[in-house]
Amino acid sequence: MAYYDDGGNDSQPFGRAQGGIQGPRRPRLVTDYGSSMVQWMRNRRPKYQGGHRMETERPSASYMVDMLPPLARIHSPVDSIPVRHLHQSIGKSKKPITVVRWTPEGRRLLTGGHTGEFMLWNGTAFNFETVMDKGDVKYWRPNFNNVETIDDAHHDAVRDLAWSPSDTKFLSASDDTTLKIYDFTARTCDTVLTGHNWDVKSCDWHPTKGLLVSGSKDHQVKFWDPRTARCLTTLHSHKNTVTATKFSRVNNNLLATSSRDQTARVFDLRMMRDICILRGHEKPISTLTWHPVHCSLISTGSEDGSLYHYLLDEPNLPAGQIPTVAPYDSPDPANTPAQVIYPAHRIQYAHAATIWTLDWHPLGHILASGSKDNFTRFWSRARPGETSYLKDRFHIGEEAAEAQGTWSRNFGRRQMREEEEQELQDEADSLVDQRKTPGTGLPGIQSASQPDGLGSSLLPGIGAAQPPPPPGLSTSMAPPGNAFPPNPVFPAFPFAPPFSGAPPASGAQPMNSPNVNLAELQKQLAAQGITLPPGFPHHFTPVSTPLAGGGLPGLQGGYQPDNNYGR
């Protein structure tokens, strides 16, 4: 793995003259998680063959090549604590970052700014890729086409979104005191959840159950049934605004919440009570996140810019405090007070202002943080034998790091200018926000009018047109109208006929059209260096009988989305 190095020789970094930025640009280092995955896949063996537990890396730089992904250390969450700063990114607008989210495959990171625009960063080299305009709730495809916009989704700011397990619904939380459940394909509001008395700051959808949770400025945590829009129960454990509510994706029985009362709590859904209280922050906690692999590792961010990591199985009590008993270890778990947990690792100066958002890479080796100081920073675990991170400016502060010689303020300014230059160059080469022309489909994506419940004509890939009926089906059972989209073939050749999924009209001879000139087609292909096979026909043979049922089987999608709320 290659990581970004925040240290180095201050006198002449990377060949640049003192006090200037002329000379070769600093090489962009990347994080290559592929090497650790390959190492794990090559060395692991199933349990029935023995030797499935591999040798642990020793504290030496020579063991760097033996680093394994967090999945190989499921029972050792301490190895995945992100203690080392990798890189920091800042957008051209230089506005506070309110949300960061990794794409499901982990190749890119999406960040949302205070002005409403959002940016896309490369997840390996952390370079800027593209920027999007601000606006309302919008649907985007990976090719950066704005597919759809929901105007006036709420009457006030939308604070959080959460997806259903089937990805057909999503939940929104707003400062207008309501939560709304939207149908993704129909782009309509199905249910409005009311019950909070103040701004709703966070929400989440259980990964396997039909259960919703929300946190509000009224200090309450509420559970909801998405089918009936009924509030199931309310928790009153916090004494100030609830800033984050997150279900664990590893242990589905756990819920974590954070609040401005400087604490975070872990609830067990089976007992419907808190089992852990996370203390240690000196300012209100603004966000938290679960590790995607280890259910006992929680990271929290505070309004003073500190980043703390907690291990639920290690209390880490300060000296002089009496340890408390976990409810699980008590003979009376229902009445035992929640166990107090203190951080296993503290990054006191992670940001210069409030940390508003945290998100883990899907593999669990990189943590991204977004802050009011306009920076998006990336954190990772330490390499074998590495301890220098304990003396960097993020752990002991800029003044102390400068006094110890581990960081230079002048070098930091030059480094910032270099990064800004690189971001400007990346933006010049970035992808373009491709706006969809109103009333038109996306290039290469078929669209068609479809009956309700069969998908969406505006959201390609979500549902599809109804397939043609099989031969002998009664006309009363067939779908109304022709819902089969045109399917142009060879768009580069204007003389090729357009085909459709529907059968040809009675008496028509589409395969013997005078517009089809195979001789001309053969010349065009030969000019491009394409050799046709021997016996290539010079004209089409008329088809006496059209395909029964219309079109070719498999060309028309017949997938009907699952509109259930839960699994």
UniProtKB/Swiss-Prot annotation:
<feature type="repeat" description="WD 3">
    <location>
        <begin position="195"/>
        <end position="234"/>
    </location>
</feature>
<feature type="repeat" description="WD 1">
    <location>
        <begin position="92"/>
        <end position="131"/>
    </location>
</feature>
<dbReference type="GO" id="GO:0000785">
    <property type="term" value="C:chromatin"/>
</dbReference>
<feature type="region of interest" description="Disordered">
    <location>
        <begin position="416"/>
        <end position="478"/>
    </location>
</feature>
<dbReference type="GO" id="GO:0180010">
    <property type="term" value="P:co-transcriptional mRNA 3'-end processing, cleavage and polyadenylation pathway"/>
</dbReference>
<keyword id="KW-0159">Chromosome partition</keyword>
<feature type="region of interest" description="Disordered">
    <location>
        <begin position="1"/>
        <end position="28"/>
    </location>
</feature>
<feature type="repeat" description="WD 6">
    <location>
        <begin position="350"/>
        <end position="389"/>
    </location>
</feature>
<protein>
    <recommendedName>
        <fullName>Polyadenylation factor subunit 2</fullName>
    </recommendedName>
</protein>
<dbReference type="InterPro" id="IPR001680">
    <property type="entry name" value="WD40_rpt"/>
</dbReference>
<feature type="compositionally biased region" description="Acidic residues">
    <location>
        <begin position="418"/>
        <end position="430"/>
    </location>
</feature>
<comment type="function">
    <text>Required for 3'-end cleavage and polyadenylation of pre-mRNAs. Also involved in chromosome segregation where it has a role in chromosome attachment to the mitotic spindle.</text>
</comment>
<keyword id="KW-0507">mRNA processing</keyword>
<dbReference type="GO" id="GO:0007059">
    <property type="term" value="P:chromosome segregation"/>
</dbReference>
<feature type="repeat" description="WD 5">
    <location>
        <begin position="280"/>
        <end position="320"/>
    </location>
</feature>
<dbReference type="Pfam" id="PF00400">
    <property type="entry name" value="WD40"/>
</dbReference>
<feature type="region of interest" description="Disordered">
    <location>
        <begin position="545"/>
        <end position="567"/>
    </location>
</feature>
<feature type="compositionally biased region" description="Gly residues">
    <location>
        <begin position="548"/>
        <end position="557"/>
    </location>
</feature>
<dbReference type="InterPro" id="IPR036322">
    <property type="entry name" value="WD40_repeat_dom_sf"/>
</dbReference>
<keyword id="KW-0853">WD repeat</keyword>
<dbReference type="InterPro" id="IPR015943">
    <property type="entry name" value="WD40/YVTN_repeat-like_dom_sf"/>
</dbReference>
<keyword id="KW-0677">Repeat</keyword>
<feature type="repeat" description="WD 4">
    <location>
        <begin position="237"/>
        <end position="277"/>
    </location>
</feature>
<dbReference type="InterPro" id="IPR045245">
    <property type="entry name" value="Pfs2-like"/>
</dbReference>
<dbReference type="GO" id="GO:0005847">
    <property type="term" value="C:mRNA cleavage and polyadenylation specificity factor complex"/>
</dbReference>
<feature type="repeat" description="WD 2">
    <location>
        <begin position="153"/>
        <end position="192"/>
    </location>
</feature>
<keyword id="KW-0539">Nucleus</keyword>
